[in-house]
């Protein structure tokens, strides 16, 4: 038995990773015949995709020559390689001549490039699989959950590279086809003006047409204004109206507290009574009804891990998306609690990376991503304390990346004798594809809930 295992190990060590030297040769030879093919080829492959080291060196040298404005041919390429002492490493002049000679046409060069790329991806999968296996043998103190996150993020990085070639400029005909198809879909599907995810708030829907897929939505407010409550209400409404899951990342509050708020909101039961357990029969009946609905739908996921990194949020969101064949909404509370260890010494760059990743996630999964944000204390010094975009903490990247920015303002927080008690202003500070303005909602703090405002709204 031991001998058989040893034999298999030896066989595995002799395995040659998948590659196609013929396809690599055809790509390089084709580029020497027709330099104009470089742009299309470079959309498909990079130097590291070549299995043969001489081929990698040749491709790199071709790129350098083109960057300097020189043509690629047998003479220029061999001369450049010789000056750098690399000609011997690639097989000398005779091998370059063979590449050029054995490539009769460039007609299928992109197909050959695809073959090179496909083999490279499979090799990378093998490499990543080995790294994952090694991580399992040598955990370095990491728990199984951390190892799973590492494995998942490693595989998804390969997937990102795999689909990168689908990006880039599109002809107007293709974009028009996609646009007309979207318009026709909206025309044929009754939606009462809501083209995105229904917020559950009539006046807010009129302003935004719902929370649009692929958009990054920032909700910001000073403490005690109710930003977590508002964001949770949006998640609750989405969970009740749609079947696909809502994913909540709560970096600040434990999942149990989130659920208590949710039960109070959906059951219309005073959250103080829920927290203290002082419930009457009617309260229990309401809560039981809500629990039954939540268990029937089973479409809310809460991750209360602290200090998550953008890559962890992305990998976990992808996992839930994949397991459920889609998502309705993602919410992060709040983004300043996320961390990027490699950028920890520069908070501005750290927030920029977090913002960029969340925007990319929304676009990748085609779902709205809501991120809660803090506001600068400086607004407290103003007479009018209604927030504006510049009040966003580390505002530059957030304001730039966000498609929709909503601020919450409740006058009663600052003015004890305010005649606007129980009224919240949802201030739309930015909307990339719609108007800005203000919508009023009723704030029922004892239920941890914002509701539609029955009085007259204003713009």
Swiss-Prot record:
InterPro entries reported in the protein's UniProt record: AAA+_ATPase, DNA_heli_DnaB-like_N_sf, DNA_helicase_DnaB, DNA_helicase_DnaB-like_C, DNA_helicase_DnaB-like_N, DNA_helicase_N/primase_C, P-loop_NTPase
SMART domains for this protein: AAA
Catalyzed reactions per annotation: Couples ATP hydrolysis with the unwinding of duplex DNA at the replication fork by translocating in the 5'-3' direction. This creates two antiparallel DNA single strands (ssDNA). The leading ssDNA polymer is the template for DNA polymerase III holoenzyme which synthesizes a continuous strand; ATP + H2O = ADP + phosphate + H(+)
PROSITE patterns: SF4_HELICASE
GO molecular function, one term: ATP hydrolysis activity
Entry binding sites for ATP: 221-228
UniProt KW DNA-binding keyword: yes
Similarity comment text for this entry: Belongs to the helicase family. DnaB subfamily.
Protein's job: The main replicative DNA helicase, it participates in initiation and elongation during chromosome replication. Travels ahead of the DNA replisome, separating dsDNA into templates for DNA synthesis. A processive ATP-dependent 5'-3' DNA helicase it has DNA-dependent ATPase activity.
Self-association and partners: Homohexamer.
UniProt name for this protein: Replicative DNA helicase DnaB
Gene it is expressed from: dnaB
């Amino acid at each position: 038995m031991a001998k058989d295992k040893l034999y298999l190990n030896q066989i595995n060590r002799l395995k040659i990773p998948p590659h196609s030297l013929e396809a690599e040769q055809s790509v390089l030879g084709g580029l020497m015949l027709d330099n104009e093919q470089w742009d299309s080829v470079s959309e498909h492959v990079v130097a590291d995709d070549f299995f043969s080291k001489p081929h990698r060196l040749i491709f790199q040298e071709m790129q350098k020559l083109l960057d300097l404005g020189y043509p690629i041919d047998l003479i220029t390429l061999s001369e450049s390689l010789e000056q750098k002492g690399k000609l011997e490493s690639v097989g000398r002049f005779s091998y370059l001549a063979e590449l050029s000679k054995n490539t009769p046409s460039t007609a299928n060069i992109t197909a050959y490039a695809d073959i090179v790329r496909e083999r490279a991806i499979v090799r990378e999968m093998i490499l990543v699989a080995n790294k994952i296996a090694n991580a399992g043998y040598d955990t370095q103190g990491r728990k199984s959950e951390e190892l799973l996150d590492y494995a998942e993020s490693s595989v998804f990085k390969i997937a990102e590279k795999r689909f990168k070639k689908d990006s880039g400029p599109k002809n107007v005909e293709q974009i028009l086809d996609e646009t007309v198809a979207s318009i026709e879909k909206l025309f044929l599907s009754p939606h009462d003006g809501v083209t995105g995810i229904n917020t559950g708030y009539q006046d807010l829907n009129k302003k935004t047409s719902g929370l649009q897929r692929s958009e990054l939505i920032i909700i910001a407010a000073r403490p005690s204004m109710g930003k977590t409550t508002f964001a949770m209400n949006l998640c609750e409404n989405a969970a009740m109206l749609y079947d696909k899951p809502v994913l909540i990342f709560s970096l600040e509050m434990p999942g149990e507290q989130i659920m208590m708020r949710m039960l109070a909101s959906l059951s219309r039961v005073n959250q103080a009574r829920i927290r203290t357990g002082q419930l009457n029969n009617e309260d229990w009946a309401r809560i039981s009804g809500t629990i039954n609905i939540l268990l029937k739908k089973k479409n809310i996921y809460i991750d209360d891990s602290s200090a998550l990194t953008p890559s962890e949020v992305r990998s976990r969101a992808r996992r839930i998306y994949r397991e459920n064949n889609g998502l309705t909404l993602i919410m992060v509370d709040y983004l300043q609690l996320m961390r990027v260890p490699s950028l920890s010494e520069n908070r501005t760059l750290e927030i920029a990376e977090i913002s960029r990743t969340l925007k990319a996630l929304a676009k990748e999964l085609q779902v709205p991503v809501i991120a809660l944000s803090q506001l600068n204390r400086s607004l407290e010094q103003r007479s009018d304390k209604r927030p504006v975009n510049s009040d966003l903490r580390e505002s530059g990247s957030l304001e730039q990346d966000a498609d929709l920015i909503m601020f919450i303002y409740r006058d009663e927080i600052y003015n004890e004798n305010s005649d606007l008690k129980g009224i919240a202003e949802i201030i739309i500070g930015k909307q990339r594809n719609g108007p800005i303005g203000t919508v009023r909602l009723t704030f029922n703090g004892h239920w941890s809930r914002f509701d539609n405002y029955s009085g007259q709204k204003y713009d």
